[in-house]
């Protein structure tokens, strides 16, 4: 049996493990991790689809939300519209955060080849933050993306496990006569490429994936959207709550699916946190050993300014001490 080297138990080893990877490397590698997790999720969706109890035998479970809210078939489409709107708003917010980063490092506003009055001003101007300005603006867009994508990957991975463990009867009308998956490979690719919109899977309950992304956008704008414009918080809050209503009213998920997803998403987003070093060092351990997709050391500052490293040997230090 191989004996671990002594240095693994030393402080220097763990100090190296805690040393943060470059932010650009984290962006690339965690995005790749998210794609891999997406494929794992689709495989889990196929398993739950096959294991779902027969709707003709097992009826949906009693649900207080179903009793309080009138059933409105097809409302899940509006939930998809809410997600689409928040996707666009989050991309816009991330771009504005990038402009704040440029302003922080002293770069000027970007310019379009042709100036369009009003449009250029709206998209390319720097909206100086008036809330949460205690957060360092340097690399704010990169850190926000790392926090978003790592939280999302963690939630999807846990969802892949949880929904396979216990199969629940599906309350959704579309799943009362569930379609059969003919080509599994095609279904996997179609589901990943369309973010689930191009296929129908049943039994993927506990917890709601729609609620996860709605809540992630809510948390993203609650922290970072307020730095761009004060109105983003109330607007996104209203849209997210309406999306929750659409999910329950359409019987797309049980109320518990929505409540558990809200809690787990908020807790995960807070646990990942905002840090100038990017993701927590424990998460960086999963991507630190990669031989590709970015550098493993911060030899150059994130804004592209070279870092000067001064090394003094012992003889030089002794000479300076004597002089």
From Swiss-Prot:
Recorded catalytic activity of this chain's protein: an N-acylsphing-4-enine + a 1,2-diacyl-sn-glycero-3-phosphoethanolamine = an N-acylsphing-4-enine 1-phosphoethanolamine + a 1,2-diacyl-sn-glycerol; an N-acylsphinganine + a 1,2-diacyl-sn-glycero-3-phosphoethanolamine = an N-acylsphinganine-1-phosphoethanolamine + a 1,2-diacyl-sn-glycerol
Keywords from the UniProt entry: Kinase, Lipid metabolism, Membrane, Sphingolipid metabolism, Transferase, Transmembrane, Transmembrane helix
Transmembrane feature ranges: 27-47, 75-95, 148-168, 188-208, 234-254, 258-278
Gene: SLS2
Protein name: Phosphatidylethanolamine:ceramide ethanolaminephosphotransferase
Deletion consequences: Elevated ceramide levels and growth arrest; cells were arrested in division but replication of DNA and organelles continued giving rise to cells containing multiple nuclei, kinetoplasts and flagella.
Membrane topology type: Multi-pass membrane protein
GO molecular function annotations of the record: ceramide cholinephosphotransferase activity; kinase activity; sphingomyelin synthase activity
Segments on the Extracellular side according to the record's topology features: 48-74, 169-187, 255-257
Family the entry assigns: Belongs to the sphingomyelin synthase family.
InterPro entries: Sphingomyelin_synth-like, Sphingomyelin_synth-like_dom
EC number from the UniProt entry: 2.7.8.-
Cytoplasmic side: 1-26, 96-147, 209-233, 279-323
Top-tier EC class: transferase
Main location: membrane
Example of a GO cellular component annotation carried by this entry: Golgi membrane
Coiled-coil regions listed: none
Record bears the keyword Cytoplasm: no
Gene Ontology biological process terms from the UniProt entry: ceramide biosynthetic process
Listed Pfam families: PAP2_C
């Amino acid at each position: 049996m191989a004996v671990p080297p002594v240095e693994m138990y030393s402080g220097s080893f763990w100090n190296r493990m805690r040393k943060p990877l470059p932010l650009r490397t984290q962006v690339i590698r965690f995005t790749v991790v998210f794609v891999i997790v997406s494929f794992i999720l689709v495989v889990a969706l196929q398993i739950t689809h096959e294991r779902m109890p027969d709707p003709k035998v097992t009826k949906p479970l009693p649900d207080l939300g179903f009793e309080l809210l009138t059933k409105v078939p097809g409302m899940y489409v509006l939930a998809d519209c809410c997600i689409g709107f928040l996707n666009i708003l989050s991309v816009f917010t991330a771009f504005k955060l990038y402009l704040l980063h440029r302003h922080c490092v002293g770069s000027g506003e970007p310019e379009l080849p042709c100036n369009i009055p009003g449009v250029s001003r709206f998209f390319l101007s720097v909206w100086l933050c008036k809330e949460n300005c205690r957060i360092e603006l340097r690399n704010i867009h990169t850190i926000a993306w790392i926090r978003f994508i790592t939280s999302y990957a963690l939630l999807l991975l846990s969802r892949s496990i949880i929904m396979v463990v216990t199969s629940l009867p599906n309350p959704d009308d579309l799943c009362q006569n569930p379609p059969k998956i003919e080509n599994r490979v095609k279904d996997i690719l179609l589901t990943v490429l369309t973010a689930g919109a191009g296929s129908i899977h049943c039994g993927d309950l506990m917890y709601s994936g729609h609620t996860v992304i709605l809540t992630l956008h809510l948390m993203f704008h609650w922290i970072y959207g307020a730095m761009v414009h004060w109105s983003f918080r109330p607007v996104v809050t209203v849209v997210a709550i309406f999306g929750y209503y659409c999910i329950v009213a359409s019987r797309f998920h049980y109320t518990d699916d929505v409540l558990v997803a809200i809690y787990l998403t908020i807790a995960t987003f807070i646990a990942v946190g905002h840090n100038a070093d990017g993701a927590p060092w424990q998460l960086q351990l999963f991507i630190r050993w990669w031989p590709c997709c970015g550098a493993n050391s911060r030899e150059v500052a994130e804004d592209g300014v070279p870092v000067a490293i001064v090394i003094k040997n012992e003889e030089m230090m002794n000479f300076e001490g004597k002089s």
